[in-house]
Regions:
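Acidic/His- and Gly-rich active-site-bordering loop/insert found
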Residues: 1-97
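Histidine/acidic-residue-rich, glycine-tolerant segments that coordinate divalent metal ions
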Residues: 43-48, 63-71, 75-76, 95-166
């Protein structure tokens, strides 16, 4: 439902007010402490759960392409981020982790993550993750100082930006 709501109401870079609010509300409803307008960026946010010393960042993108809507799948990235963080949150204290969801606006040409990085958003994170849809049936992982992973997806591959007819 979250992915569909975002898809039905696309907002472009730095204008993702309703999208950011939907995501903040979804995370708050799941027990996350939410900070809007994170680090002075109006459509960025931070949502946290747990209080462990190991900090895990989950990035959520939610801006749309001008004239194309969510052809790059940022509605999926955002919904997956909420799902991953929501699955980890109930285990956070037991695992000794803090789950941090970073709402990263303006990823379609606006450099939202760069702005957040420059403002210190990701300082001290032990791990940062994000899922992104793509045009092929493989998971490509480029980990730094971690083991490679192999994931099998079943279904038909399609990417709205690369293969809109599929």
């Amino acid at each position: 439902a979250l992915s569909e709501a975002l898809h039905a109401d696309p907002e472009t870079a730095w204008n993702e007010h309703r999208s950011a609010a939907r995501l903040r509300d979804a995370l708050a409803a799941r027990g996350f402490a939410v900070t809007a307008a994170y680090l002075g960026l109006e459509t960025a946010f931070l949502a946290t759960a747990g209080s462990g010393p190991v900090r895990i960042g989950v990035c959520a993108e939610y801006d749309a392409l001008p004239g194309l809507g969510h052809a790059c799948g940022h509605n999926l990235i955002a919904a997956i981020a909420v799902g991953v963080a929501s699955a980890l949150a109930p285990l956070a204290d037991e695992l000794g982790i803090t789950v941090e969801v970073y709402g990263t606006p303006a990823e379609e040409g606006g450099g939202g993550k760069i702005e957040l990085l420059d403002r210190g958003a990701f300082a001290g994170l032990d791990l940062a993750v994000m899922a992104h849809p793509g045009p092929v049936d493989v998971a490509e992982a480029r980990p730094f100082a971690v083991a490679h992973s192999h994931v099998r997806y079943d279904g038909k591959a399609a990417h709205a930006g690369a293969y809109p007819e599929e």
